Amino acid sequence: GVKDASSALFRKASSPDRQVLEQYFDSLRDVERSIEQARANGREASVDAKLAKLDPALKAGNLGERIRAMLDLIVLAFWTDSTRVASCMLANTNSRIHYDFMGVNAEFHYVSHHVRNKKVLPAYDSINAWHTGQLCYLIEKMKTLQDGSGTLYDNSLILWGSGIKHGDYHSLTDLPVVLAGGGGGQVDLGRHVRYPEARPFGNLLLTLMKLMKAPADRIGDSTGLLPGISGKANFRRANQDDG
């Protein structure tokens, strides 16, 4: 079985390889435990009368545990080279989920419309901060795993952001986007980059695909590559905004 195969592998492995294997199996057990805990919390969680009337899909409940388990699986899949691409959507722009586990008993979509209802801003900020915390969790998890001469984080690219800029105005321009990970040393991090004119979001996607050697010349509405992403690119620093 799997246990016998892993034991045989341990016996054959060198000391450094055994350390990697131990880290892998420890991570795997952590994922198993988190999934079991998420299931248990999902069965045992109690909700108030208002939430009890909602469609189960709209109650976040143990969303935190489920998201962490998914992120752990993504990290393990990258580390073992089971896949080199993953996508994880924490919420969509029309999300009706109630983040009850954080004390927010209103729809995410409702609190995103705050121009004429400032009272919902604390709830909206809390949800956005929680989403950002999941990115931080993913990054820190990837930094703990050795990958070649660096870490898994050093050799990966993480694109994080939203498909909409402002909930009230449904703005689709100047999207908030964070690019993390070293991309194997190809990406110049620690900057806030603004472009002098609008660029299709597809240009960013195409540029990242090219950095990863993906065989593509176009994606979505792309019109070309986006300058300034790679540390090797010729990019005028006048377009950089650190404020």
Describe each model-derived feature in a short phrase.
Residues G1-G243:
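Ligand-binding pockets and gating/stacking loops
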